[in-house]
Amino acid sequence: VKRPMNAFMVWSQNERRKIMDQWPDMHNAEISKRLGRRWQLLQDSEKIPFVKEASVRLKHMADYPDYKYRP
């Protein structure tokens, strides 16, 4: 069972692709840093759609109440 994505992960999935299209040689660590900075600059109102999508996590928790994340 996969771990559900939080709002940042939902948002960053698409944003990561955009960055990789523009700068295909950029290292993943640098992309992640940029994504983190950009997420912090977003207004709460801009994050709402991603927070709602991440609410799937609640359904996941209801469907799998004994789930424990193990990296």
Swiss-Prot record:
It is found in: Nucleus. Pfam families: HMG_box (PF00505). One of its GO terms (cellular component) is nucleus. SMART domains: HMG. Keywords: DNA-binding, Nucleus. GO terms for biological process: brain development; camera-type eye morphogenesis; negative regulation of transcription by RNA polymerase II; neuron differentiation. The keyword S-adenosyl-L-methionine does not apply. The keyword Transmembrane helix does not apply. One of its GO terms (molecular function) is RNA polymerase II cis-regulatory region sequence-specific DNA binding. Residues 1-68 bind DNA. InterPro entries: HMG_box_dom, HMG_box_dom_sf, SRY-related_HMG-box_TF-like. PANTHER family: SOX TRANSCRIPTION FACTOR (PTHR10270), TRANSCRIPTION FACTOR SOX-12 (PTHR10270:SF221). This is SRY-related protein LG28. It comes from Eublepharis macularius.
